[in-house]
């Protein structure tokens, strides 16, 4: 079709151009009928959703490509120009290509950003205005599926069985619709619920390097929210490695968060998480919009009364892609080369992640800090929106304590006696005080040994080591690796256990009794068993 449309470039008269456009639409329709009969390829499967809209496309204005520079495509129209953020469609090497209008130039020309590769486009090629913005499918049919930035399935399982779609560009909820109540979202993970609790509708920054358990923690959060709250999750891979995205998909199936369509006659019914990927190799337009696509799906669940967990990995790459798009559009960069609209772009995303009177979206965002510089504009802009941070420590992971959350570096604005209650706040402060004192004594212990400590400090060190181990917890999604069944611990049990540890109620139990258990009752049983084994 590209050649057929391109050959009309030499036509000089307006009537000839219109005739070529009409013939191009007819050829496009015949191609779509042929592709509907072949579902073996994910690209052809994806094109089903695209060709379903051909009638709408034909009603919109028809333009012509005038210039292609990387991911930027200039399109000229004869009449009225498409609105800013409108989606334009053309065909590139047999595949559907979506262009998003970014600027209105002179001479009836718009500048657009491509959502896929522009290799193969030619000047004079016809482009159709869809008269709407980029829309993605929403609803329960998206659960268990992998989609790209424009909502096409890329998991080779067939089309997404829904007719409900929503524009990726939505306004933040009105003030009157937002919920002002401060409520904890219990995750069932002891270290998070006690020391850095998440709030419904809150935003959490997840800091962690490679191999410290970030992916496992993300998967456990998805698993626990789904089981304890009956809620859904959405994972947006922004600039992700393809390998990591593939691993996450299959790990979710193995841990029963999602249903394997191959084992369920092609159906993903019963799945709890939708995945939207804009991979590292994709153009900046796709990486800059994929977070909005994922958020749109999460918003639809929230508006249906669900408590949704929304993951973004990595929020820095969202900013990075925005900087690339800004440079391609010719904007003058601001500090450190970032786009001048950095704060606006970040605010437009973050302000949509909020609770309403019907449901909530809780966001967990992985954040990369360039060169460990927290003053870099990208992470600094993100920090302004965070309600809590969960820091994963390599030194804790080296001790074999998982989840490897640093109890002293992690914090939450929800840890306030007016929100969590006096007892919870007091116990959390006692735990942090003991661990902080233990950290300050570690140099003395390393040089002089435990014998040089006072009796009071020896007692404190013993409690601190038990607290450290009690902060560990077997995860459901890691059962195949640990051999231990996962534990979801209620908040009341968590507070009860750490309150007793701080008070010295369990000073007589061995440290090993507190390692990789759920509630304090399990630790007591394990301790009695260990003491009996040692006595025999």
Swiss-Prot record:
SMART domains, sorted: AAA
Q: Where is this region: Disordered?
A: 1-57
Give the molecular function GO annotations: ATP binding; ATP hydrolysis activity; proton-transporting ATP synthase activity, rotational mechanism
EC number(s) on record?
A: 7.1.2.2
Ranges in coiled-coil conformation = none
Among the entry's GO cellular component annotations, what is one?
proton-transporting ATP synthase complex
Instruction: Name the HAMAP family on file.
Output: ATP_synth_beta_bact
According to its UniProt entry, the function of this protein is described as: Produces ATP from ADP in the presence of a proton gradient across the membrane. The catalytic sites are hosted primarily by the beta subunits.
Alphabetical list of NCBIfam families matching this protein: atpD
State what protein this is by name.
ATP synthase subunit beta
What gene, per UniProt, encodes this protein? atpD
């Amino acid at each position: 079709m590209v050649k057929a449309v391109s050959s009309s470039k030499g036509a000089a008269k307006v009537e000839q151009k219109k005739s070529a456009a009409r013939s191009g639409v007819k050829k496009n329709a015949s191609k779509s009928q042929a592709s509907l009969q072949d579902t073996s390829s994910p690209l052809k499967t994806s094109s089903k959703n695209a060709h379903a809209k051909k009638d709408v496309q034909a009603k919109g204005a028809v333009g012509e490509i005038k210039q292609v520079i990387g991911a930027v495509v200039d399109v000229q129209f004869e009449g009225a120009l498409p609105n800013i953020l409108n989606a334009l469609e053309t065909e590139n090497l047999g595949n559907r290509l979506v262009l998003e209008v970014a600027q209105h130039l002179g001479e009836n020309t718009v500048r657009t950003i491509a959502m896929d590769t522009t290799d193969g486009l030619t000047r004079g090629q016809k482009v159709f205005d869809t008269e709407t913005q980029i829309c993605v499918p929403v609803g329960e049919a998206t659960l268990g599926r992998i989609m790209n930035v424009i909502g096409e399935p890329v998991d080779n399982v067939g089309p997404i069985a829904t007719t409900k779609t929503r524009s990726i560009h939505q306004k933040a909820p009105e003030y009157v619709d937002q919920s002002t109540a401060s409520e904890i979202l219990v995750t069932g993970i002891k270290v998070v619920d006690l020391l850095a609790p998440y709030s419904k509708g809150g935003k959490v920054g997840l800091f962690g390097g490679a191999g410290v358990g970030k992916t496992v923690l993300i998967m456990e959060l998805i698993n626990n929210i789904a089981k304890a709250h009956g809620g859904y999750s959405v994972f947006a891979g922004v600039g992700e490695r393809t390998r990591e995205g593939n691993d996450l998909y299959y790990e979710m199936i193995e841990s029963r968060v999602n249903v394997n369509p191959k084992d369920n006659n092609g159906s993903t019914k019963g799945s709890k998480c939708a995945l939207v990927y804009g991979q590292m190799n994709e153009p900046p337009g796709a990486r800059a919009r994929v977070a909005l696509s994922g958020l749109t799906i999460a918003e639809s669940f929230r508006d249906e009364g669900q408590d949704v967990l929304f993951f973004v990995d990595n929020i820095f790459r969202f900013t990075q892609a925005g900087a690339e798009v800004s440079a391609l559009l010719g904007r003058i960069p601001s500090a450190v080369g970032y786009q001048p609209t950095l704060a606006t772009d970040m605010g437009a995303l973050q302000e949509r992640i909020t609770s309403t009177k019907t449901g909530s979206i809780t966001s967990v965002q992985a954040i990369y800090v360039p060169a460990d510089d927290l003053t870099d504009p990208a992470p600094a802009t993100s920090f302004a929106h965070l309600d809590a941070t969960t820091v994963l420590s390599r030194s804790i992971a080296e001790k074999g304590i998982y989840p490897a959350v640093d109890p002293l570096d992690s914090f939450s604005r929800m840890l306030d006696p007016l929100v969590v209650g006096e007892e919870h706040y007091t116990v959390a402060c006692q735990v942090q005080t003991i661990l902080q004192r233990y950290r300050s004594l570690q140099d003395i212990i390393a040089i002089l040994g435990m014998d040089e400590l006072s009796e009071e400090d020896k007692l404190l060190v013993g409690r601190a080591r038990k607290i450290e181990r009690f902060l560990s917890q077997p995860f459901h999604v890691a059962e195949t690796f640990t051999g231990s069944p996962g534990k979801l611990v209620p908040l009341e049990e968590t507070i009860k256990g750490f309150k007793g540890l701080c008070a010295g109620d369990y000073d007589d139990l061995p440290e090993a009794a507190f390692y990789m258990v759920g509630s304090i009752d399990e630790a007591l049983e394990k301790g009695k068993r260990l003491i009996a084994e040692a006595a025999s």
